[in-house]
Amino acid sequence: METRKEDGNLHRSGKRTGYLIYSSEGYMSVSFMKAGRTEFASGDIRGGSVEEKIEAFNGYISYSGRFEVSEDTVTHVIEVSLFPNWIGERQERYYELSNDRLTLSTPLQLVGGMKLSSHLVWEKVGA
């Protein structure tokens, strides 16, 4: 994964682990996380310090809903999301399919106070 600034310069890149699923019925789901996330010291899913919760939230993205495909874009119609502001949104992704790899790129989005575009390469797993 890499993110680029408004001027096209690289902002950040790094490995992410996750799944992107598209069903033949028109539903999609995506969950991915940065590598090396720290476990909560307490081991309690509702526990954790404020800092642990912030780090956990900032290192994970998840949403699901319906999808629509056009010639060069796929639109995710978000129904559930870790980030509540995305619920009900229609988010467009530019796509490129090559062999067993799908590259999705976002238009500019507000991330950490900056306008960034994200580019993720997904690899097909066993059919």
Each language-model region and where it sits:
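Lipid interaction determinants
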Residues: M1-Y63, V69-A127
